[in-house]
UniProtKB/Swiss-Prot annotation:
Organism: Drosophila melanogaster (Fruit fly)
Keyword Signal: yes
Cellular localisation: Cell membrane
GO cellular component annotations of the record: plasma membrane; rhabdomere microvillus membrane
Described function: Acts as a ligand for sevenless tyrosine-kinase receptor during eye development.
Extracellular compartment residues: 32-530
Region ranges (Disordered): 38-84, 825-844, 861-896
Protein name, UniProt field: Protein bride of sevenless
Tissue: Expressed exclusively by R8 photoreceptor cells and is internalized in a sev-dependent manner by R7 cells.
Length: 896
């Protein structure tokens, strides 16, 4: 009743009722929000794992574990569950797609949970998936480096020494992920996975180091990844000087033997030969009954079947299989492996080894190569920490939590010119392993097979120490020699004394040492691809040039009259024949069977002569072509009114220009040949050809080409001589482009220069052929056909056509001379008008044609003897020209 009364009273008082409803609504809304905020089924926002960005205050990284996290509560509402999954999907950042588990573990990229994986197809076991634990060794640290190498233990040892020495003076350590590369074909996949791991699973990652050989193999992939990836310097810089020194100091007999060097790569061969020359030791291959073989690498031992003295230099760790493939009494030169244990004392300062290194062995060359780059990187890191971090109050070390943007220096360090080299003693001192220097030795062993039982054939192989050289002190020690040979080592002739360089050929870096003896070198065609290309171009160009030359000679013999004197065209064709034939000296070589073949004094003279012939031909044929083009360009620019000099240069002056240009170049080339022959010991053609003096030899030819280019504005509009002006312009521009191309290519090295010079010659010849001679031949053929058609028309018998034809044949300008029309009256000559239109070639200037025009002139005199001369038609552009001067006498007509 009270409620009804209240409602009834509310009808009478609506304002209190409305206020009551608003209060009830607000209370309900607050209750609902409170329930939502305290609901156990509400999940927090998921955490996205991406590459961390440096901030002003960065906390130390938290390690990611693989155990599944527990959820706060679960919901039974399907709609809410699907909605949450839809929000999580775009936030998950992973390199590999995996099934959704519905837990926060799915927020972590799969590569962070499982690490790196390799799928290997084996013939015996099928498809095998290798886990990260099988090929990755890890030293934990706050700032991480990765290494892809064949020797992960040496890389781990270097980082251990960096942390023990605390080169960065910080309260954190450097971590490393050392990835063992057993198969080079798997390196690309592992590198890509490691980049993804460092980007998504680590907070502070500096970059990745890769073995030198792998870096060269993956260089294109590394550029595409755009990550901090650097090569580890090769170990050959530490090994090859030791090999050369031990060989030089090794006791040897008095008899010299032929030396054959076998390497896996040409780069390895060149580096060893340079190390041998530093010892002034020449290891040459020649005809001999006694042979010495020096074999580099671990892959060639099983292929060695020769008899002789063998020196084997493995570049990686050796095993029993490698030693078993070597013949008995073979010498092995390799670095000793240093065993790591708790009993090894590395330095006077007490240090410790990480547990993962106990019982392992390292190679000195690997340690020194990697340590040099790491020390320089740590110095840069310490400098960056001093700018972006604060020191702690207790230990005066840089505190990681106070650092910001301290890895930005890497962009500058990755540039090689900013790096510094460190010698061996400095590396050992900085990494607190000075006492390890006595164990870093490069040793020479000799394999000996001892027969234990003659009946069963049981044998035992041992390596007998011959000599060793220390990496730090370079002191050489010999073992057992005095006892085994019953003589003093100092009284024995050394290997380096027997194979000493007998003669040094000046500064010739290609053939620096010469020998007396029988030559083993021979002639052959080069096996390079560019030789086949150049020979093809030369043969085709020679065929085309001969075809044009035969065509012109045949047409001249038939009595055709061309625009202009064909003599220059014939000379230009002959010069092109020389251009295309000049490829022969560049396509042959004088070599031996081995790269280190014995070079005698006679061989050096032969090589010097071949080089001189190449230089002489190159400069001379360029001069022939450019001189002819220049004299034609001068003539075109000096005649007519198409923008030239408006002064005439006759054929004699053209001949003088061409002859002077050629004789000047011949004189300079002959002088060079004489100087190289007289002073062959001090002046080497190889140094000229492969050095900067080559540009001095080509300076004169380049000046002629520039002169032709300077005349382009004066000749490009000329229509004379089958539009020779524009054709010379096209040919000159093509030659200039070709010159820029081959000169640029020749700057990349000797091999590029060997190909660029002859190919540039052939391309220049084809530029003249395609730009000038082939179009001109087409215009000649077209002119001959037009002349044949014009002479076949009925108007040939008309008097007007005969007079016009007579005029066109009597032009004395620019060799437009027709011998058949020279006998004309003076009145007809005075009424001729100038014309710049090229004339048509006339067929045959024989007696029948002369009799035909004589009859026409007689008929003209009988029909109209008092005919007034026609008034010349003056064009507005040539109003100042009325007529040409009288035609010269028969014996004064000159063809240009």
């Amino acid at each position: 009743m009270k409620v009804m009364d209240a409602l009834q009273s509310g009808r009478r008082k609506p304002l209190p009722v409305a206020l009551l409803c608003i209060l009830v609504t607000v209370f309900c809304v607050l209750e609902c929000h409170g329930a939502d905020l305290t609901s156990p089924t509400k999940k927090s926002a998921p955490l996205r794992i991406t590459k961390p960005q440096p901030t002003s205050q960065q906390a130390k990284p938290i390690s990611i574990t693989t155990r599944a996290p527990t959820t706060v509560a679960s919901t039974t509402d399907d709609e809410v569950s699907s909605s949450v999954d839809g929000q999580l999907a775009p936030l998950i950042s992973s390199t590999t797609e995996g099934p959704s588990s519905g837990t926060t573990a799915s927020l972590v990229p799969e590569i962070c949970l499982n690490g790196l994986q390799l799928t290997v197809n084996s013939a015996d076991e099928g498809t095998v998936i290798r886990k990260q634990e099988e090929f990755v060794k890890i030293l934990e640290g706050d700032v991480v480096l990765s290494v892809l190498t064949k020797d992960p233990d040496s890389a781990l040892f270097v980082i251990n020494r960096v942390n023990q020495a605390n080169l960065i003076m910080a309260d954190f350590e450097i971590g490393i992920r050392a990835i063992s590369i057993d198969n080079a074909s798997l390196a690309e996949n592992l590198l890509i996975q490691e980049v993804q791991f460092l980007q998504q699973c680590t907070t502070y990652s500096m970059g990745i180091f890769v073995d030198w050989e792998l870096y060269k193999q993956l260089e294109s992939v590394i550029k595409d990844l755009e990550y901090n990836i650097w090569p580890i310097p090769g170990t050959r810089a530490h090994l090859f000087p030791k090999v050369a020194h031990l060989l030089h100091q090794m006791p040897w007999g008095e008899k010299i033997a032929s030396v054959e060097i076998a390497t896996e790569t040409l780069e390895m061969y060149n580096e060893f030969m340079e190390a041998a020359r530093q010892e002034h030791m020449c290891l040459m291959h020649f005809k001999s009954d006694d042979n010495v073989y020096i074999m580099f690498g671990n892959k060639l031992a099983s292929h060695f079947k020769e008899n002789g003295t063998l020196f084997s230099v493995p570049t990686d760790r050796t095993d029993d299989e490698f030693l078993a493939d070597l013949p008995n009494r073979a010498f092995v030169l390799m670095e000793n492996e240093i065993d790591l244990s708790t009993a090894v004392e590395l330095d006077a300062t007490p240090t410790a080894l990480d547990e993962i290194l106990i019982g392992k062995s390292v190679l000195p060359s690997r340690v020194l190569s990697f340590a040099g780059s790491i020390i320089d990187l740590m110095n840069w890191l310490r400098g960056s920490l001093s700018k972006h971090c604060k020191r702690g109050e207790e230990h005066d070390l840089y505190v990681l939590e106070s650092c910001f943007n301290f890895l930005n220096f890497i962009e500058d360090w990755r540039t090689s010119e900013y790096r510094q080299a460190h010698d061996t003693a400095e590396i050992l001192s900085l990494l607190l392993m000075r006492k390890l220097g006595t164990a870093m030795n490069f040793q020479m062993y000799q394999k000996k097979v001892l027969t234990l039982d003659k009946i069963t054939g049981e044998s035992r192989t041992e390596l007998r120490e011959i000599a060793s050289q220390n990496f730090v002190t370079n002191v050489t020690t010999y073992y057992h020699y005095n006892r085994d040979n019953h003589t003093s080592l100092e009284l024995k002739t050394k290997f380096g004394q027997v194979f000493n360089c007998q003669y040094s050929a000046g500064d010739n870096r290609r053939y620096p040492f010469l020998f007396d003896g029988e030559s083993v070198m021979f002639w052959r065609i080069k096996m390079d691809t560019w030789v086949a290309t150049g020979l093809t171009a030369a043969i085709l160009g020679l065929i085309a040039t001969l075809a044009i030359l035969v065509f012109i000679v045949v047409r001249i013999s038939l009595g055709d009259v061309f625009e202009g004197n064909p003599t220059t065209s014939i000379l230009l064709l002959l010069s092109l024949i020389l251009v295309f034939c000049s490829f022969v000296p560049y396509s042959i070589e004088y070599v031996g069977e081995q790269r280190n073949s014995h070079v005698t004094f006679e061989d050096a003279q032969t090589l010097n002569t071949l080089c001189a012939v190449r230089v002489f031909i190159m400069t001379l044929v360029y001069c022939f072509v450019f001189s002819l083009l220049l004299c034609r360009a001068v003539m075109l620019a000096s005649i007519g009114s198409e923008g030239g000099f408006l002064s005439h240069v006759n054929g004699y002056i053209q001949a003088v220009i061409c002859a002077f240009s050629v004789v000047a170049q011949v004189g300079m080339s002959v002088q060079l040949l004489v100087v190289m022959h007289v002073a062959s010991e001090t002046v080497s053609c190889e140094n000229i050809y492969y050095g900067r003096w080559l540009w001095g030899l080509l300076a004169y030819d380049f000046a002629l080409l520039c002169c032709v280019g300077a005349l382009i504005p004066s000749i490009y509009r000329s229509q004379r001589n089958y539009r020779e002006g524009i054709l010379i312009v096209i040919g000159s521009v093509l030659i200039m482009v070709i010159w820029v191309a081959w000169i640029a290519l020749s700057l990349f090295g000797d091999e590029w220069r060997d190909a660029a010079i002859p190919l540039g010659l052939q391309a220049s010849g084809w530029a003249v052929l395609v730009g000038i001679l082939i179009p001109r031949t087409f215009l000649i053929v077209r002119g001959i056909e037009r002349s044949d058609i014009a002479q076949a028309l009925p108007s040939l018998t008309s008097l007007a056509f005969a007079q016009n034809n007579q005029y066109s044949s009597e032009q004395s300008v620019y060799e437009c001379v027709n011998p058949a029309m020279r006998h004309c009256s003076q009145d007809e000559v005075n009424h001729q008008s100038p014309s710049e239109i090229p004339t048509l070639p006339l067929r045959g200037g024989g007696p029948r044609r002369q009799q035909f025009f004589a009859n026409l002139r007689q008929a003209n005199a009988n029909i109209n003897p008092q005919r007034p001369p026609p008034r010349p038609q003056q064009s507005p552009s040539r109003s100042s020209v009325s007529s040409l001067p009288p035609s010269p006498d028969h014996n004064k007509i000159t063809r240009f």
